[in-house]
Amino acid sequence: AEYFTNDVKEIDGVRVYGHMDYGKRAPDLGWRMTDAWLSMAGAGSVGKPNGVPVDEWGIRMESGTCNPVGADVARGGAANGPAAVYAIRKWDEWLRSYAPPGAASMDFYQSLPALSSGNVAQQIFWYTAFTASMVAPKSSGNKTVDDNGNPLWRMGPSPKGPYWDEGMKLGYQDAGSWTLFKSTPVDRRKAAWLYAQFVVSKTVSLKKSHVGLTIIRDSDINHKSFTERAPKLGGLVEFYRSPNRVLWSPTGINVPDYPKLAQIWWQQ
């Protein structure tokens, strides 16, 4: 980050930066921390898909139950522990020292167009949902591919902070699921279940994976069509075929009410 921002400075007359992030006071700021800065620093306990008994949010859960008991260090949590303090300090330091001007006032939705402008050398972590935009043809205005559509970038392993130990999660990805409410009339529930089978069927899922590049089936990522397309996807296929994919996990069961907690988390 320091090398590109302070040593290289310019490439072909264009100012370049070694980092991209965002810092606007908005709910997505909370995502930035709980999604990966905290887990990469080593907040929480060893455990997959999330730490046990303390997850990457720093929330401790009673052993053998689904009862969260606290996030403060004084209550056995880690939300204000050394790893969390380190993560937020580094996020702030890198944002102000190495990211483009104005990044501190951007939110999640403003940072992606800035990233695809082509003058940011690297990002400490990103969401694979960005891939489709980053491999779009140059004719669409995307500056992160060459004239032949080959990515001018490469996905790399998530970096590890000083408090990270083997066996911890290391990154984040959303995991979709179908929720069928008991309160929904049975005939409608059956219809929803049938539709779900269609959506996750191999044929539909493979097509969806090629369009959105968000993989949900093992058969999708191992399909020969993805082997053929892999050179154009900057490491996405290799990542999802590697053991590292299990280190990227969604928010876990220690978080009792995500919408309510997410609303207050970023403000603190």
Question: Model-flagged regions — what are they?
Answer:
Residues 2-5, 46-105, 149, 158:
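Glycine-centered hinge/linker elements that transmit conformational signals in sensory
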Residues 96-101, 110, 119-122, 138-220, ...:
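Extracytoplasmic/periplasmic substrate-recognition and gating elements
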Residues 4, 111-115, 130-132, 192, ...:
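Short, hydrophobic alpha-helical packing/hinge segments within bilobed ligand-binding/sensory domains
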Residues 1-2, 22-70, 170-181, 260-268:
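Periplasmic solute-binding protein
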Residues 214, 235-268:
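C-terminal capping/gating helix-and-loop segments adjacent to ligand/active sites or protein-protein/ligand interfaces
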Residues 121-126, 133:
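Paired acidic/hydrophobic, glycine-rich loop segments that form the ligand-binding mouth/hinge
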Residues 4-23, 201-213:
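Bilobed periplasmic-binding protein-like "clamshell/Venus-flytrap" ligand-binding domains
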Residues 2-7, 109-119, 123, 267:
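Short helices/loops that flank or line small-molecule/ion binding pockets
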